[in-house]
Curated annotation (Swiss-Prot):
It comes from Marinobacter nauticus (strain ATCC 700491 / DSM 11845 / VT8). NCBIfam families: ATP_synt_delta, PRK05758.2-2. Pfam families: OSCP (PF00213). F(1)F(0) ATP synthase produces ATP from ADP in the presence of a proton or sodium gradient. F-type ATPases consist of two structural domains, F(1) containing the extramembraneous catalytic core and F(0) containing the membrane proton channel, linked together by a central stalk and a peripheral stalk. During catalysis, ATP synthesis in the catalytic domain of F(1) is coupled via a rotary mechanism of the central stalk subunits to proton translocation. This is ATP synthase subunit delta. One of its GO terms (cellular component) is plasma membrane. InterPro entries: ATP_synth_OSCP/delta_N_sf (IPR026015), ATPase_OSCP/d_CS (IPR020781), ATPase_OSCP/dsu (IPR000711).
Amino acid sequence: MAELTTLARPYAKAVFDAAQDQNAVDQWDQALAFAAQVAADQEVKNILANPGLSEQRKAELFAECFEEPLPEALRNFLLILAENKRLALLPEISALFRLYRADLEKSVHLTIDTAFDLSADEQQKLIDALSKKLERKVELETTVDQSLIGGVIVRTGDLVIDASVRGKLARMARALGS
């Protein structure tokens, strides 16, 4: 996974810079998200792995998956990826693009696992507290995991903050066991 991200990073950075220059970050974000879904499809993976197809043909077939004619810049980007045998990296490129966009917009996407459903008021208080602490606009996604017993687990990117009762019990058990 880290290797794929390393390979995808220069492409994501280049396309993000180009999108900024064109004032088209939102359009590129949407196009890359769709392209990432297409690239993740098993049939498409099989086509991309077919050694009997030229890289140009693979890019053309890939472009045909879009409902509308592609802007020339996106078509050229797909062709560059195809020529470098990197079309399969589109999910990673899209994810990195979204991280660059979030950084630009000073926003962060957090996933919160809780032991019980949070009310709208509790969610808003959590968003306000995290926004103040992180100095960013917070987009919150919550899931319920009753095995946590209580507390929360906060995830964003590579950062995980485990403030759950289950996590605290596990840390105590490790400390007592050593």
